[in-house]
Amino acid sequence: MNATERPGSDGTGSPESVGSRLKNLLHGPGTCQLMGVHDGLSARIAVAEGFEALWASGLCMSTARGVRDSDEASWTELLTLVGTMTEAAPGAPVLVDGDTGYGNFNTARPSPPAPSCLGAAGVCFEDKVFPKMNSFFGDGHQLAPIGEFSGKIKACKDTQRDPGFVVVARTEALISNLPMEEALTRAHAYVEAVADGLFIHSRMSTPQQIAEFMRQWDGSAPILIAPTTYHRPSLDDFAALGIAGCIWANHSMRAAFSAMRDVCQQIRADRGIFGVEERVAPLKEIFGLLDYESLEQDENRYTQAPDLAPVQG
């Protein structure tokens, strides 16, 4: 059994892929939580704190690279970060933010095999045109034609090698201030293109648009949301609406951003570190999370073994 598999949930002991596990979470009772991560450390922390699934956020990975969330980081660069996540949190389903797929169906369809080989559970594509802009910045969010994006989703499903791999279609219709009817039309078209799930995005300060969408949705595919701007409702509130997956998309990165900025300001102002020591994680906690102790045990096992007699030949 490899790092992307675990014993099956049916009691047979057959391995369950991370993609199949993500599907089970999205089709199971309640609302699955996906914690936004951007590198191996953030993934390890999220899993250690009990999150069952992870969201490899395009915004957060781009920010970690020091560039804007406007397709400035290449797919290859983002996959490098995804690899650190799956290595740091083996067995945890990682849904990768694939942005627009970096072009048309032909540039997008290699996307499922690449993250799948890295141990990711799935990839999510949005129906903006390439290059995209982050959904929370500006108003110039142009969408691809429905048929064109549906073809992109179908091409990706036809290309995937692992039958359990998840392809999620994300519509930005509400972000683009289009009517609810357009969001529903796009959602139904993407399900017909065999998307495994739908990500419905909104940037209102309340969940009103999401609630209205769910009232009209026929339940033909699980719905995921990212309540970044409508942050007051709880997970139970979203479960009552019938939401399958809730993505806490960027809060680890934003927390790290604030903490790093504040510590830098304090050290520069104090001309020393005496004012920040109580605000930063003890090295002992970091060593514990990354399991330094097992390395020490392995060193004792492999470097202090008795010398073996040379082979005579």
Swiss-Prot record:
Pathway of action: Secondary metabolite biosynthesis; bialaphos biosynthesis
Pfam families: PEP_mutase (PF13714)
Substrates-to-products reaction catalysed: phosphoenolpyruvate + H(+) = 3-phosphonopyruvate
Superkingdom per UniProt: Bacteria
E.C. number(s) listed in UniProt: 5.4.2.9
Region of interest (Disordered), ranges: 1-23
Keyword Isomerase applies: yes
Catalytic residues (positions): D69
NCBIfam families: PEP_mutase
Function summary: Formation of a carbon-phosphorus bond by converting phosphoenolpyruvate (PEP) to phosphonopyruvate (P-Pyr).
Name recorded for this polypeptide: Phosphoenolpyruvate phosphomutase
Species classification: Bacteria, Bacillati, Actinomycetota, Actinomycetes, Kitasatosporales
